[in-house]
């Protein structure tokens, strides 16, 4: 049976690697492995998110949903050292890599968690995510609905999705589901959506 990056316990044989994240304000060397999302490079969607998302708030609880080996969580933690960054993933190997990478990068404000971990707070300031589209539309919608509801009033989520993986239909669904969304960047076939928890929404 094949192993997927959204499996809780990947069965793929270990193939350790290293990915360098080079941004104008952050440089990271991150350990990777098989069985996690994009283990061989910083994928272009995640790069778009890291380069174009609005700066995170200086403090509060920030979430990397579907953290993989930790590039988003570690960049968030670097940019907001007084905040707590929750790196959430169903994949045990991904969580282990993220914790190790945060430790090696000197980022004590990163906390890893499973999606059902009660320690993750319910008033999140920001969510950044390259969501696991391949889990299927129904599962994706349920996941996003659950986590977006945990944004504090005025909180924002930045979601990056490939156009050929349904970015435009996801944008439409967010609007129809009552989540105001705007496309704030596009590059290399990816869309970056900014979703706001408007307390006035119905």
Give residue spans per PLM region.
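General small-molecule cofactor/ligand-binding pocket signal
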Residues: 31, 111-113, 182-184
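Glycine-rich phosphate-binding "P-loop"
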Residues: 126-138
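A short glycine-rich, Lys/Arg-flanked "PGG" loop and its adjoining helix->strand segment in the class I
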Residues: 141-153
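N-terminal auxiliary segments of SAM/dcSAM-dependent transferases
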Residues: 1-24, 35, 39
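Conserved SAM/SAH cofactor-binding pocket of Class I
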Residues: 44-121, 126-129
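Conserved beta-strand signature within the Rossmann-like core of class I S-adenosyl-L-methionine
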Residues: 154-161
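Short "lid" loop at the C-terminus of a central beta-strand within the Rossmann-like core
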Residues: 133-135, 162-167
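Class I S-adenosyl-L-methionine
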Residues: 3-15, 166-202
């Amino acid at each position: 049976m094949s192993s997927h990056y959204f499996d809780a316990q990947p069965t793929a044989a270990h193939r350790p690697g290293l990915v360098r994240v080079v941004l104008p304000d952050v440089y990271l060397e991150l350990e990777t492995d098989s069985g996690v999302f994009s283990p061989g490079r910083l994928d272009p969607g995640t790069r778009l998110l890291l380069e174009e998302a609005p700066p995170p708030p200086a403090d509060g609880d920030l979430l990397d949903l579907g953290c993989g080996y930790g590039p988003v969580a570690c960049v968030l933690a670097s940019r907001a050292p007084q905040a707590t960054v929750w790196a959430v993933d169903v994949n045990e190997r991904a969580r282990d890599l993220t914790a190790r990478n945060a430790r090696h990068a000197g980022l004590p404000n990163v906390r890893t968690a499973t999606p059902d971990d009660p320690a993750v707070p319910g008033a999140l300031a920001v969510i950044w995510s390259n969501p696991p589209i391949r889990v299927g539309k129904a599962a994706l919608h349920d996941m996003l609905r659950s986590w977006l509801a945990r944004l504090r009033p005025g909180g924002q989520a930045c979601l990056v999705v490939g156009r050929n993986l349904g970015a435009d239909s996801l944008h439409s669904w967010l609007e129809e589901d009552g989540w105001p969304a705007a496309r704030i960047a596009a590059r290399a076939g990816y869309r970056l959506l900014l979703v706001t928890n408007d307390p006035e929404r119905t």
